[in-house]
Every structure is written in C-alpha cells, then in structure tokens.
C-alpha cells in the first residue's frame, strides 16, 4: 500500500522562503536612501528599457529587485490602485503607507496560497507634500508580505551585506544630491566588487538607473536622472572633494610664508 507524499507546513514555508531568497539574490542590487531634497533611488541596471524604478503616484515612488515580470506586474497593479483611489476620493488620500500595505497583503497571499512565491523585494517611498516638512518615508516589503519602515535607507537584491555595511559607514542625514548619489554608487560598487573578479571593470554610470522623489516640486515629485546628469553630479562631487583636500595644503603654505616674512623682517 502506498502512502501519499506528505510535507509539513513548516518545511513547505522554509522551502518557499529559500526559493524566493535565492531568486532575489540572483538579481542586481537596488539602493533607496533619504537625502535633504527627498528620496534617491539607484539601481544596478544596464538595460535602458527594463526599469526597476518607477513612479506610483504624485509623491510616491517604487523600486524592486528580483524577477522583472513579477515585480512589473505588481508595479502596474499599484499604479492602477493609486489612480482609482485618487480619482474616487482625493489625490492626498493616496499615501506610501497605504500602497505598501496593499503590496504586503498581495505578497502574503501569494506566498501562502500559490504554488510558487514571487521572487521579489519591493521598496515604496513617499515624500511630503509641497510646503510640508515631514521626513521621507521608506517601506521595505519582502516576498512573504512582511513590511518594515526604514528610517534612512533600503538595500535589496544581489549581495546586500557589503552594500549595507558601506552605507552604515558612509551614510549621512540631510546630504545634498551629489553627496547622496556618491554614497549610493560607492555602496553599490562595494557589492559589485564582492561578486566580481579582479579583471572586471568597476561599476560605471552606463550600468546604473537612478531617479529621485523631489520634495521641492509642487505636484509630481518623481524625476529620472539621465546618465549625463549622473556623470555631472558625480563629477561635481569629485571636484568638491578635491577642493576640500587642497584647502589645508594652501593654509599650511600660507602659514610657512607668514613665518618666513616675520623672520625676514626681524633681520
């Protein structure tokens, strides 16, 4: 007599979690962080058409890591939900927390009821309405529907440990856009170096996708950063660093010159 194959619920959940985590880890990394002007998204993404970062509504942005077809389906569903609610009630009634809760419920249902969980991790970010001073909100939603409110930054996809470590060491609150971009790019490079061999090139602007939620814009806060803009911002940061490094040298030379002149005058 043959017995039907049985698997305990705990083992089934463990196997689903392992499947989802491995799928997310195979993807490229994404960083979202708060800065002085709003929220910055930076993703390792060489594709120009398959985008990981998107606008959900006026003041709400979206970023994801994992399987593109799965998180793109969630992205489109979030946009439809936001548009419907904003039309039926008021545009201010659409919030980042509300959309994050919808995504958490959807992913939780998929994880427990469907045969295969979604191999995705999401970030929903919101900036305050124009004229308000509320801090940006960042929400992380994982494959099983878990949701967390992150105060400063979110790291998803790929090898997250070196990127998170780099951000903990370099992140500063209320940084300007060039500084925030440099922090995010250097953190992504730390994760890329962890996975690549020595002969592979350093992660460049051509392999990056970036956008911001600009809290200083009156209505639609989302704005993509082109690759030329990225290059300009990073060069601005480099020139700022070089100027700061030259200042102490000049002051020391000035001190030496001043001492010399005093000695000459005494003679």
UniProtKB/Swiss-Prot annotation:
GO terms for cellular component: cytoplasm; proteasome core complex, alpha-subunit complex. Its main location: cytoplasm. The keyword Cytoplasm applies. Keywords: Cytoplasm, Proteasome. InterPro entries: Ntn_hydrolases_N (IPR029055), Proteasome_alpha (IPR050115), Proteasome_alpha-type (IPR023332), Proteasome_asu_bac (IPR022296), Proteasome_sua/b (IPR001353). It comes from the Bacteria. Gene3D superfamilies: Glutamine Phosphoribosylpyrophosphate, subunit 1, domain 1 (3.60.20.10). Residues 231-267 are annotated as: Disordered. Residues 234-243, 252-267 have a biased composition (Basic and acidic residues). GO terms for biological process: modification-dependent protein catabolic process; proteasomal protein catabolic process. Pathway: Protein degradation; proteasomal Pup-dependent pathway. The keyword Aminoacyl-tRNA synthetase does not apply. The formation of the proteasomal ATPase ARC-20S proteasome complex, likely via the docking of the C-termini of ARC into the intersubunit pockets in the alpha-rings, may trigger opening of the gate for substrate entry. Interconversion between the open-gate and close-gate conformations leads to a dynamic regulation of the 20S proteasome proteolysis activity. One of its GO terms (molecular function) is threonine-type endopeptidase activity. It is found in: Cytoplasm. Signal peptide: none annotated. Belongs to the peptidase T1A family. Component of the proteasome core, a large protease complex with broad specificity involved in protein degradation. The 20S proteasome core is composed of 14 alpha and 14 beta subunits that assemble into four stacked heptameric rings, resulting in a barrel-shaped structure. The two inner rings, each composed of seven catalytic beta subunits, are sandwiched by two outer rings, each composed of seven alpha subunits. The catalytic chamber with the active sites is on the inside of the barrel. Has a gated structure, the ends of the cylinder being occluded by the N-termini of the alpha-subunits. Is capped by the proteasome-associated ATPase, ARC. PANTHER family: PROTEASOME SUBUNIT ALPHA/BETA. This is Proteasome subunit alpha. It comes from Mycobacterium ulcerans (strain Agy99). The gene is prcA.
């Amino acid at each position: 007599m043959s017995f039907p194959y049985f698997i305990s619920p705990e083992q089934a959940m463990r196997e689903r979690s392992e499947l989802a985590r491995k799928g997310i880890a195979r993807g490229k990394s994404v960083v979202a962080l708060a800065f002085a002007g709003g929220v910055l998204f930076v993703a390792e993404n060489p594709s120009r058409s398959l985008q990981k970062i998107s606008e959900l509504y006026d003041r709400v942005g979206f970023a994801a890591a994992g399987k593109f077809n799965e998180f793109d389906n969630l992205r489109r569903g979030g946009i439809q939900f936001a548009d419907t609610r904003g039309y039926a009630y008021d545009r201010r009634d659409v919030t980042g927390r509300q959309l994050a809760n919808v995504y958490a419920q959807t992913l939780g249902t998929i994880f427990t009821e469907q045969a295969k969980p979604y191999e995705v991790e999401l970030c929903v970010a919101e900036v305050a309405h124009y004229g308000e001073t509320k801090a940006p909100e960042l929400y992380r939603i994982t494959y099983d529907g878990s949701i967390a409110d992150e105060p400063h930054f979110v790291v998803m996809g790929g090898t997250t440990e070196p990127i998170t470590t780099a951000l903990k060491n370099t992140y500063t609150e209320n940084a300007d856009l060039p500084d925030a971009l440099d922090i995010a790019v250097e953190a992504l490079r730390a994760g890329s170096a962890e996975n690549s061999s020595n002969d592979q090139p350093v992660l460049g602007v051509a392999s990056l996708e970036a956008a911001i939620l600009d809290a200083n814009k009156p209505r639609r806060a989302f704005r993509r950063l082109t690759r030329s803009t990225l290059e300009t911002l990073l060069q601005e940061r480099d020139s700022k660093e070089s100027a700061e490094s030259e200042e102490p040298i000049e002051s020391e030379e000035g001190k030496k010159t001043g001492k010399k002149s005093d000695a000459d005058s005494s003679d």
